[in-house]
Swiss-Prot record:
Pfam families: CASP_dom
Record-linked NCBIfam families: A_tha_TIGR01569
Subunit structure: Homodimer and heterodimers.
Organism, scientific name: Glycine max (Soybean)
The name this protein goes by in its record: CASP-like protein 1E2
UniProt GO cellular component terms: plasma membrane
Keywords, in A-Z order: Cell membrane, Membrane, Transmembrane, Transmembrane helix
Main location: membrane
Membrane disposition: Multi-pass membrane protein
Transmembrane segments: 23-43, 78-98, 115-135, 158-178
Location relative to the cell: Cell membrane
């Protein structure tokens, strides 16, 4: 057939998903920072002697008070979310190293669990941050006094733990976003 041009079409075949260095580094980062956040909050404790005025006619009574992480359920939740995310990060890192992108089903499960970790960590961070704001500012409407002026070290350590945990949240968020961007670029 003369005059008919033959154009070859390149057929793109899906390759198995290779585990990228960025994926491994983000999982390692998520593991490290969620572990650090959990440890920092788990050792957060401060004792102070606080003067309590019982009556105007009596001198203040000095009472030792201790602030501990397990006294507030939001902080307990924060610790548990970081422990779960830390455990998941190390397990997914090991699976990524062993599997090396061979099983599509496993990577689908990991992608779903990565998104779950984002939600879990951000909810834990939000709960802890809400308690932290109450600690720093109090709430005059319900007569909750601020406590961070008394337990400064405790509050600073809690704030540092929340900040470190946010890095873990962002690492998991990137683990969700990057594959989506790569998939979009292929199409």
């Amino acid at each position: 057939m003369e005059g008919v041009e033959s154009k070859e079409r390149e057929v793109m075949v899906a390759k198995p998903v290779a585990v990228g260095v960025s994926d491994l580094l983000l999982r390692l980062l998520a593991f490290t920072v969620t572990l650090v956040a959990a440890i920092v909050i788990a050792v957060d404790k401060q004792t102070k002697v606080v003067p309590i005025q019982l009556s105007d006619s009596l001198p203040p009574l000095d009472v030792p008070l201790t602030a501990k992480w397990h006294q507030m359920s939001a902080i307990v939740y924060f610790l548990v979310t970081n422990a779960i995310a830390c455990t998941y990060a190390v397990l997914s890192l090991l699976l990524a190293l062993v599997n090396r992108g061979k099983s599509k089903g496993l990577w689908t499960l990991i992608a779903v669990l990565d998104a779950f970790m984002v939600a879990l960590l951000f909810s834990g961070n939000g709960a802890a941050a809400a308690v932290g704001v109450l600690g720093y500012k109090g709430n005059s409407h319900v007569n909750w006094n601020k406590v961070c002026n008394v337990f400064g070290k405790f509050c600073d350590q809690m704030a540092a733990s929340i900040g470190v945990s946010l890095i873990g949240s962002l690492a998991f968020l990137l683990l969700v976003i990057i594959p989506g961007v790569r998939l979009h670029r292929r199409n």
